[in-house]
Amino acid sequence: MSTTPVVNFITGNANKLREVKAILEPGITVQSKTVNLEEVQGTVEEVTLAKCRKAAEIIQGPVLVEDTCLCFKALNDLPGPYIKWFMESIGHQGLNNLLVAYEDKSADAVCTFAYSPGPGHEPILFQGRTRGKIVPPRGPADFGWDAIFEYDGQTYAEMDKTAKNNISHRGLALRKLQDWFAQQ
């Protein structure tokens, strides 16, 4: 008889926590821990691995960390892993303004999770990617850049939460994590 895996999801973002719990539970128990982790500069993979190693040391147990990118094709994948700071600095309209001079409004939403069973264990990466485009804000503006990322005619903000979780970058990455746990 197997036991339900437990992970300590390291986040201070209530919206992310809700999404992760909605996707993973009841198969994987998600506990929330807020730990102030310094974000290194680098690729999304480097950032996520560094955060996971540090969190595992602090928590002294199994941890799950996440890093999200929004990659504008016209800007050679910027803002990429720096989307959080771009959002805080220039908001939805500013992000749209970055693409005014370009015909190509396509973008990839990329979510990278790292899981570690604890300190001393090398983290395992799980990545999901959704191709969409950047549009003027539509829908509630209460979750990051969801209101400007359109997939198949709807922004993430306009979508029903279950529908979004089925196709989103975060949902895709978490399904890979679920598959990995099922193999253990």
Curated annotation (Swiss-Prot):
InterPro entries per the record? ITPase, ITPase-like_fam, RdgB/HAM1
Q: Does the keyword Nucleotide-binding apply?
A: yes
The GO annotation for biological process reads: deoxyribonucleoside triphosphate catabolic process; nucleotide metabolic process
The domain of life for this entry's organism is Eukaryota
Entry EC number(s): 3.6.1.66
How many cofactors are bound and how? Binds 1 divalent metal cation per subunit; can use either Mg(2+) or Mn(2+).
Checking Pfam families in the record gives:
Ham1p_like
Keyword field contains Nucleotide-binding: yes
- GO cellular component entries: cytoplasm; nucleus
What keywords is this UniProt entry annotated with? Cytoplasm, Hydrolase, Magnesium, Manganese, Metal-binding, Nucleotide metabolism, Nucleotide-binding, Nucleus
Q: Which residues bind Mg(2+)?
A: 39
Record family assignment: Belongs to the HAM1 NTPase family.
Q: How does it assemble?
A: Homodimer.
In Swiss-Prot or TrEMBL terms, this protein is called: Inosine triphosphate pyrophosphatase
